[in-house]
């Protein structure tokens, strides 16, 4: 049987929530606005499928380049290259540094 190569493959633990965190996210997280140059962490919320970046970017840190509708364009370093990913604010956290 051939291996499945879907968007969420090999994410059994990465895209799962602990029992206390299950359920919907706070609405303020969806309404959060970032400005250009803000540093954000990509932390995927598995309860929201829309605007979810690829799971390989989970845990990465990048800078906000611009806004695209409800989502944000974030520039993340992947290996030696910079890649632009589109993610909604539910999947982003503001960096404290």
Swiss-Prot record:
- Keywords assigned by UniProt? Ribonucleoprotein, Ribosomal protein
- Specify whether Cell membrane is a keyword of the entry: no
GO biological processes: translation
Q: Which residues form a coiled coil?
A: none
Gene Ontology CC annotations of this record: ribonucleoprotein complex; ribosome
Q: Which PROSITE patterns match?
A: RIBOSOMAL_L21E
Gene Ontology MF: a single term? structural constituent of ribosome
Q: What Gene3D superfamilies does this protein map onto?
A: Ribosomal protein L21 (2.30.30.70)
Q: Do you know which InterPro entries this protein is assigned to?
A: Ribosomal_eL21, Ribosomal_eL21_arc, Ribosomal_eL21_CS, Ribosomal_eL21_sf, Translation_prot_SH3-like_sf
Q: Which family does it belong to?
A: Belongs to the eukaryotic ribosomal protein eL21 family.
* Descriptive protein name: Large ribosomal subunit protein eL21
Q: Which organism is it from?
A: Methanococcus vannielii (strain ATCC 35089 / DSM 1224 / JCM 13029 / OCM 148 / SB)
Provide the gene name from the record.
rpl21e
């Amino acid at each position: 049987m051939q291996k499945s190569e879907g968007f969420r493959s090999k994410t059994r633990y990465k895209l799962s929530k602990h029992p206390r965190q299950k359920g919907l996210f706070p609405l303020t997280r969806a309404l959060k606005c970032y400005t250009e140059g803000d540093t954000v962490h990509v932390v995927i919320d598995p309860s929201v499928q829309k605007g979810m970046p690829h799971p390989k970017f989970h845990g990465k840190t990048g800078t906000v380049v611009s806004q695209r509708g409800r989502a944000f364009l974030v520039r993340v370093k992947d290996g030696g290259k910079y890649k632009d990913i589109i993610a909604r604010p539910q999947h982003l956290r503001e960096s404290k540094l």
